[in-house]
Amino acid sequence: AAFALPAFASFEKDVITPAALEAVLNRKAPLYNIMMENDAILNVIANVKTVISNPVLEEALLKTNHGVNGIPCGESCVWIPCLTSAVGCSCKSKVCYRNSLDN
């Protein structure tokens, strides 16, 4: 039996959209005791995630048809856990989702 990975699983790194990245930065930056510049945070994230556009991720999600898992957070979790867990997302089927019923 053939096993088809979602399109984003073919990347060497997990992916994150600019909107998801901004949500993580807005949530995490106030928590640092020593304020890191956003550029430094972006460099760290860029080492573990690849920033991609929303249409690329949306196309991959449409092809895999995992819409029942919740609202996509704009990040994959094939190799690295969801950075967007800081804003309520969790990993399901290699994609970070937020349960729309959670507050």
Curated annotation (Swiss-Prot):
Q: Which GO terms describe its biological process?
A: defense response
Give cross-link positions for Cyclopeptide (Gly-Asn): 70-99
Return the domain comment text from this UniProt entry.
The presence of a 'disulfide through disulfide knot' structurally defines this protein as a knottin.
Name the job this protein performs. Probably participates in a plant defense mechanism.
Which residues are connected by disulfide bridges in this protein? 73-89, 77-91, 82-96
Which protein are we looking at? Cycloviolacin-O9
Q: Which InterPro entries match?
A: Cyclotide, Cyclotide_bracelet_CS, Cyclotide_sf
- Propeptide feature ranges: 10-69, 100-103
Q: Which UniProt keywords apply?
A: Disulfide bond, Knottin, Plant defense, Signal
Q: Which family does it belong to?
A: Belongs to the cyclotide family. Bracelet subfamily.
PTM description: This is a cyclic peptide.
Source domain of life:
Eukaryota
The answer to whether UniProt assigns keyword Signal to this entry is yes
Signal sequence region: 1-9
